[in-house]
A protein has these predicted regions:
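Conserved glycine-rich FAD pyrophosphate-binding loop
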Residues: 27, 35, 39, 60-67, ...
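Residue-level detector of anion-binding/catalytic polar loops
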Residues: 17-21, 239-240
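FAD-binding subdomain of flavoenzyme oxidoreductases
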Residues: 1-13, 21, 287
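Charged, amphipathic alpha-helical linkers/stalks
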Residues: 11, 15, 28-63, 69
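Accessory "access/gating" subregions that flank catalytic or transport cores
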Residues: 79-82
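Short, intrinsically disordered, mixed-charge
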Residues: 9-17, 232-236
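FAD-binding core of FAD-dependent oxidoreductases
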Residues: 1, 19-28, 32-33
Length: 288
């Protein structure tokens, strides 16, 4: 983690050419995605992105029909895709699998133009043959597969919950932004959370210090209580959440955001209750 933090600092302060992408994956989400994101990986790779919307439209229609049939689950298509993917051979390149076995933390760094040589020079000097870090230069196909694997990580947690719904209570998904100079990005959870946790999954946009954190909890866990503990921890750390999505009706809006919403909608007509604000007309809290 310390070397990756130094890498981020050096790229942002010293590089002339910034990365196109810098995607982080922890080993746990890598492994989960290898199994539970395989059908997503194969679908995108072999159907192509142009055909994916049509594929999901058909899948949605099938799920809609299944909801109307007694004793059949609307998750049947997803389950079928999951088990069908097991019939296919290993889909990830050998070198990437070896890298995952060797290291706990992974960064997919995509450079272009003169930035390629700049990154190679830096990595060769600071990362090559180091006992606590290393790198590989991906071939074109390997690079595409690595990024596609990162894409599939977004659905892997949900697929895990569906397959193991008898053991899983639910998933708490957080997207958080750490302070830009915060190098303490590896999370240490309290025992109160750990004893209820099946798996914690971490991935994100490393140069932005933005992380997606999915917590899969054991059956009968009070997820709202776990969420409250997690959010208090993030508040103490100075993190912001949600980082990439609006607060909606799930999170309390900060004071500046509340002021903005009140200015934008002074009569509280268009989305009353957003950011856990009151739902009264004109925000007065005294009349409907």
């Amino acid at each position: 983690p310390a070397k990756l933090s130094q890498l981020r600092h050096d790229i942002l302060t010293k590089f002339k050419h910034l990365p196109e992408m810098a995607e982080y994956l922890h080993r746990t989400i890598f492994e989960i995605t290898k199994t539970y994101g395989k059908d997503t990986f194969l679908s995108v790779k072999y159907l192509g992105t142009k055909n994916i919307p049509r594929f999901f439209a058909i899948k949605s229609k099938v799920e809609f029909i299944l909801k109307k049939i007694p004793l059949l689950s609307d998750s049947l298509p997803d389950r079928a895709l999951f088990y069908l993917s097991k019939l296919f051979p290993q889909h990830l390149p050998k070198r990437i699998l070896e890298f995952n076995h060797k290291y706990e933390h992974h960064l997919i760094l995509k450079m272009s133009g003169e930035g390629v040589d700049e990154a190679l020079e830096y990595l060769s000097k600071n990362w090559k043959n180091k006992c606590n870090g290393g790198f590989i230069t991906c071939k074109f196909a390997e690079g595409n597969d690595a990024l596609l694997h990162r894409f599939a990580a977004g659905v892997a947690a949900g697929r895990y919950q569906m397959i193991h719904n008898n053991k899983v209570e639910g998933i708490l998904s957080l997207d958080i932004a750490l302070r830009r100079n915060d190098n303490d990005w590896v999370e240490n959870l309290p025992n109160e959370i750990n004893i209820n946790l099946v798996k914690g999954l971490y991935y994100g946009h490393f140069m932005c210090n933005v992380f997606h954190q999915n917590y899969i909890f054991k059956k009968d866990t009070n997820i709202q209580k776990m969420k409250s503990i997690m959010l208090n921890m993030l508040d103490e750390k100075g993190a912001k959440y949600p980082a990439e999505h609006n607060v909606g009706h799930l999170y309390e809006a900060e004071n500046n955001l509340q002021i903005f919403y009140k200015k934008l909608d002074p009569t509280n007509t268009f989305n009353p209750g957003i950011g856990k604000m009151n739902k009264y007309r004109n925000h007065c809290g005294c009349c409907l």
